Curated annotation (Swiss-Prot):
InterPro entries, per the entry: Ribosomal_uS15 (IPR000589), Ribosomal_uS15_bac-type (IPR005290), uS15_NS1_RNA-bd_sf (IPR009068)
NCBIfam families xrefs: S15_bact
Assembly, per entry: Part of the 30S ribosomal subunit. Forms a bridge to the 50S subunit in the 70S ribosome, contacting the 23S rRNA.
Gene3D superfamilies: 6.10.250.3130, S15/NS1, RNA-binding
CDD domains the record matches: Ribosomal_S15p_S13e
UniProt gene name: rpsO
Name of this chain's protein: Small ribosomal subunit protein uS15
Function, in words: One of the primary rRNA binding proteins, it binds directly to 16S rRNA where it helps nucleate assembly of the platform of the 30S subunit by binding and bridging several RNA helices of the 16S rRNA. Forms an intersubunit bridge (bridge B4) with the 23S rRNA of the 50S subunit in the ribosome.
GO biological process: translation
CC annotations in GO: cytosolic small ribosomal subunit
Any GO MF annotation of the entry: structural constituent of ribosome
Length: 90
């Protein structure tokens, strides 16, 4: 369920603030969103995979914390990111 390096590099290139940026909240949130969508598809097939379900909940919580941080620090980047990732604003 890990992202392959090509898909990860594509996401990093799309959301990076500058060349080589992998640690900004935007990139981290985009990578987490991709992992969450992959795990969601996995759990649609394997409904009783409770270990993956717990991992999914952990990833969702981490993304939620990063989104609240980004909303607090840079609201314009936050609103742009949630529109690009099709996430709901709370």
């Amino acid at each position: 369920m890990a992202l392959d390096s090509a898909k990860k590099a594509e996401i990093v290139a799309k959301f990076a603030r500058k060349e080589g940026d992998t640690g900004s909240p935007e990139v981290q949130i985009a990578l987490l969103s991709a992992r969450i969508s992959d795990l969601t598809e996995h759990l649609k097939i394997y409904k009783k995979d409770f270990s993956s379900r717990l991992g999914l909940l952990k990833l969702v919580g981490q993304r939620k914390r990063l989104l609240s941080y980004l909303k607090r620090k840079d609201y314009q980047a936050y609103s742009k990111l949630i529109s690009e990732l099709n996430l709901r604003d709370k």
